[in-house]
Amino acid sequence: MVLIRVLANLLILQLSYAQKSSELVIGGDECNINEHPFLVLVYYDDYQCGGTLINEEWVLTAAHCNGENMEIYLGMHSKKVPNKDRRRRVPKEKFFCDSSKTYTKWNKDIMLIRLDRPVRKSAHIAPLSLPSSPPSVGSVCRVMGWGTITSPQVTLPDVPRCANINLLDYEVCRAAYPELPATSRTLCAGILEGGKDSCGGDSGGPLICNGQFQGIVSWGGDPCAQPHEPGLYTNVFDHLDWIKGFIAGNTDVTCPP
């Protein structure tokens, strides 16, 4: 069984201005409060995703995180303890690979969000640069988010978790998930022996390999973190022209085939 890494109706998030559901990474440790100034929480209806701030006005996340009543929280660490840098934004515009907003588990699971207002850099808000080179199999990658830390049961920590996983050959994921096509614009990442993985609620968050933003959490095995069932991540590098085109105002730009 496979899992789109979104969870719903899990926990009421205690905020001074909203109440939403919440979740975290399997097998990880608590992220350092200073290591994720680019990490955002994306809430819509009763669902949660992650996302990545790529400049003061734009967030990159997964297409399957699209929904109504979307709210985006930046500068957050603890869900229970507010800090002075925390900011709330809503989408001004949302862009997908095509106008029908279609995607599959192995293609076009990417969404670019323009915020209603830019955010200023601070101690806990800063963008993550887009990658300057393609990802390399064997790289050590960092995944992070507020997703469930147990699976299939749900356990919800207060702060984001971070875990190191490996970028694997795409054929490893094809062996685990026979429905995958021969080629895909997704990355395969995880730990072959299991125990560490992104999971429900982490969708849309970043996969950072050798310090570069290479992937977007998309989907994987259910339960999460099982041996020989890595996660799938949208390949950011393959979509650079599309991302940069929209940010520059070129709405005619198209996603790679």
From Swiss-Prot:
Subcellular location: Secreted
Span of the signal peptide: 1-18
GO biological process, one term: proteolysis
Entry EC number(s): 3.4.21.-
Disulphide bond pairs: C31-C162, C49-C65, C97-C255, C141-C209, C173-C188, C199-C224
Annotated active site: H64 (charge relay system), D109 (charge relay system), S203 (charge relay system)
One MF annotation (Gene Ontology) recorded for this entry: toxin activity
Propiece span(s): 19-24
Known tissue expression: Expressed by the venom gland.
Ranges where the Peptidase S1 domain occurs: 25-248
Domain of life: Eukaryota
CC terms in the record's Gene Ontology section: extracellular region; secretory granule
Pfam hit, one: Trypsin
Keywords associated with the record: Disulfide bond, Fibrinogenolytic toxin, Hemostasis impairing toxin, Hydrolase, Protease, Secreted, Serine protease, Signal, Toxin, Zymogen
Subunit and interaction comment: Monomer.
Function as written in the Swiss-Prot or TrEMBL entry: Snake venom serine protease with fibrinogenolytic activities. Cleaves beta-chain of fibrinogen (FGB) efficiently and shows relatively lower activity on alpha-chain.
Leftover remarks: Negative results: does not have activity on gamma-chains of fibrinogen (FGG).
Family per record: Belongs to the peptidase S1 family. Snake venom subfamily.
The protein, known as: Beta-fibrinogenase mucrofibrase-4
Organism: Protobothrops mucrosquamatus (Taiwan habu)
